[in-house]
Amino acid sequence: MATTELPKFELLSLADNTSGWGPLTTSSSSVEPVPFQQFNKADRIGRVADWIGVDRFFRRGNERYNERVYGSAANAGSQFDYIHGMDEHNFQLVDTSKPMARNPQRNFRVRQMHLRKMMQKEVEKREMVNQTTNLRMKRSIAKEQQRAFKMWQRRGGNARQGQRGQGGRFGGDRPKERLPSVQVRPEWGVLEEMNLSAFSKLALPNIPGGEDIGDHQYGSLQYYDKTVDRVSVKNSVPLQRCAGVYYNVTTTEDPVIQELAQGGVGNVFGTDIILATLMTAPRSVYSWDIVAYRIGDKLFFDKRNTKDILNPVETLTVSETSAEPPSFDGNGLNNARDLATEAFYINQNFRRQVVKRNEPGFTFKNVRVPFEDEETGDATGTAYKYRKWNLGNGVDGKPVELVCRTELDGVIHGLGNETQTLTIKAFNEWDSSQAGGVDWRTKLDVQKGAVMATEIKNNSAKVAKWTLQALLAGSDTMKLGYVSRNNARSTQNHSILNTQYVKPTEFASNIALNMDNCWGILRCVIDSCMKQKPGKYLLMKDPQSPVIRLYSLPEGTFDSERESSEEENSDDDQ
């Protein structure tokens, strides 16, 4: 068996410098062709000592830029340095900018959404421009119905709900004490109580429109001044004090109604404001009373003669149906009585100011008003039309024919120069910080619909009466004005801030005024009175609850008040 020999390991011979220290002056031939390059500045390979550049150790600052210190790049050789040549044959420009990441699908969707929004805004803008005031007011119908329901609850509609308060919740606030329109005397007997909440379910459909009675149209009207339509908050007009006569003639004192009753025309008689008060009874909050005379087979709805300018039926209430109506006997200017008087003077002056008083007007068949004062002969600025309606058969089987005295306030030229009749009314702003009002001077020009909705909410009963008066008179258009105090603490000076046209039929729909329901309420009251024997009766709205009570009055009741008022009027004339 052959044995294998391992290679021998031989150590290289080390050169020994016997003549001194340090490396030999001559190197081995095996390492001469190998270049040396210091790859790391921290390599401990270099000179052991440098006795030549001693003066460089004394340099300071920037003078030491070329100093070869340990670990400096100056100690490295240049064997592996890159030397840039001038060869530009292979030179290329490289774009080092970062490319933007694009999502074309996303950009398309964004542009499409933006376009849709722009188109939607354009459509909404056109709708707002083309939308009339009547359409905008329809948005307030739901709020109006909700408010009416809350008011019904607040007035005791939910009294049977256990311990719940009048506000429909536990611990609700009690209703404010309201005064009755007339003090009920012990000798007055209660014949019937009519719940106003049940009136909302009544309906008398298919009542034809009113018919003018012969030539019984009296007075003359002035044409409306269309320059008033340019009035705005920025271009307001001071409310002038216009002279004129206001006639407050009751039903039984009207000579035309007396003539018609004697001539057998109609069997139920009343004025437009009295009938409107009965037909809008569920909306009223304050107390009012109407005298009913049952004479033979005829019924007269009349009002009491009071010492005040206006009867509670004719009072232009202010913020009656608001959440916090003004009190009757409050101190200052903003009590209910003074506000109603202020509203009366505002309406009288407004309806005279907005017509052309110095120009020829429109004259009816009878120029002279039947109850006009022969001595003064002052024009009232109001025309009177006597109209009649057929309300079907009554409780006795005979037809119920209603005769009503209606009022018109002006005329205007319509399409084709046709003369149209006007009913002119005015809202009055007293203090926007009270009774849930809004500041007209900031919102009226830009949000007239919101201001109108607020007025309908706070004055539901008054607005409904105005609308019914226009419908009973057959008025073509209603002209509504917005009159505000110049100073909230003074009732002396006012300004007209804006005006507005509405059609009575459309406006009635906007305020949820159903004529079938109104005729049903009136017919119910007529039937209740016609069931009684001939005599004198009183219909009074309870001040605290939604109830109308029918009282029987002894003979001679209220006659002393009428005599005293007539004596005062005669003393004033003297």
UniProtKB/Swiss-Prot annotation:
Gene Ontology CC entries for this record: eukaryotic 43S preinitiation complex; eukaryotic 48S preinitiation complex; eukaryotic translation initiation factor 3 complex
Region: RNA gate, residue numbers: 312-326
Residue spans of biased composition, Low complexity class: 154-163
Keywords: Cytoplasm, Initiation factor, Protein biosynthesis, RNA-binding
Location of region: Disordered: 153-178, 555-574
InterPro entries referenced in this protein's UniProt entry, alphabetically: eIF3d (IPR007783)
This protein's record includes keyword Transcription regulation: no
Entries under Pfam families matching the protein: eIF-3_zeta (PF05091)
GO BP, sorted A to Z: cap-dependent translational initiation; formation of cytoplasmic translation initiation complex; translational initiation
Bias (Acidic residues) ranges: 564-574
UniProt keyword annotation of tRNA-binding present: no
Family: Belongs to the eIF-3 subunit D family.
UniProt name for this protein: Eukaryotic translation initiation factor 3 subunit D
Organism: Caenorhabditis briggsae
